[in-house]
């Protein structure tokens, strides 16, 4: 049950939001055992983000929570796909994207 959040200072159109959601759905499958059918996504544009002391640089913070554990190679492939996606869809340079992953040992869905 992965959860991916994208927070950026870039304005996101409806079509860009849909493209991001599709791309994140594809990228999450690079993590073993994860699929788009379990994925929840939060996309937030036009946030007040200061990067390198400036508010005029396109930047993004992507956080990902996953149940269980995956190896480093899977996460690296996921991160590469996500940074490419943000560059393609929102023109955010790779160096202006911060990503984190938290592995959650207990994840509750459907109240169980």
At which residue positions do the language-model features occur?
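Interaction-mediating elements
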Residues: 1-112
């Amino acid at each position: 049950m992965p959860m991916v959040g994208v927070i950026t200072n870039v304005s996101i159109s409806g079509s860009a939001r849909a493209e991001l959601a599709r791309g994140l759905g594809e990228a999450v499958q690079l993590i073993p055992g994860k699929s788009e059918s379990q994925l929840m996504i939060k996309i937030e544009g036009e946030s007040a983000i200061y990067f390198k002391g400036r508010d005029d640089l396109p930047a993004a913070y992507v956080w990902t929570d996953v149940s269980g554990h995956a190896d480093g190679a899977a996460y690296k492939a996921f991160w590469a796909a996500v940074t490419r996606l943000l560059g393609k869809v929102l023109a955010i340079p790779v160096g202006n994207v911060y990503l984190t992953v938290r592995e959650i040992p207990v994840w509750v869905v459907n109240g169980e």
